[in-house]
Amino acid sequence: YYHNKVVRIDNVDFILSTLWSKIPSVDEFAIQNGMNDYAQILYNKRRLIPQNINDEFERNLAFIKQSVMESDADKIVVVTHHLPTFAALDERHKGSVLNTAYATELGNYIADSRITAWIYGHSHHRTDLMIGNTHLVSNPLGYVFCGENTNFDDSAVIGV
């Protein structure tokens, strides 16, 4: 598992980070009380709180931006767990108070960047979209026991 690492393969830089989401203070209570993560995960030996997530988000985003800026590769692929835009959320979740636990709106940054592709997960929903010249794609299996993602494509290939 790589976190905040860059791996170069054939002049393509893969920038790998969790990219925790940015949780606005207005959403903190609902997210902390509405998601199991906050009851189950310890952060520095204490219960996880939204501020921990926001601190990690700032570190992750700074790493991604610095790595993109420093890259001299022909192509750049960013790989994150969390979604880099609300546009990638499943329609059934649009407007949910929990959305900022899954995604952060980086659309303007992505559109202005030289990132070739951005691969992400966490949503348990297959997506394929473009922001500027960047191809954003997710093909998660989701929770198998409940048949969550019937759109999963086990033969999917992402070309860069």
Question: Positions of the model-derived regions?
Answer:
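Structural signal for conserved beta-strand scaffold positions within catalytic alpha/beta enzyme cores
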Residues: 1-3, 16, 138
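A substrate-binding/cap region within the structured catalytic cores of diverse enzymes
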Residues: 3-9, 19
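Short His-Asn-centered micro-motif
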Residues: 4, 120-121
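Binuclear metal-dependent phosphoesterase catalytic core
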Residues: 7-8, 90, 97-116, 124-160
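Divalent metal-coordination and catalytic microenvironments
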Residues: 14, 81, 122, 136
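Active-site-proximal loop/helix segment associated with metal-binding centers of metalloenzymes
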Residues: 15-77, 84-93
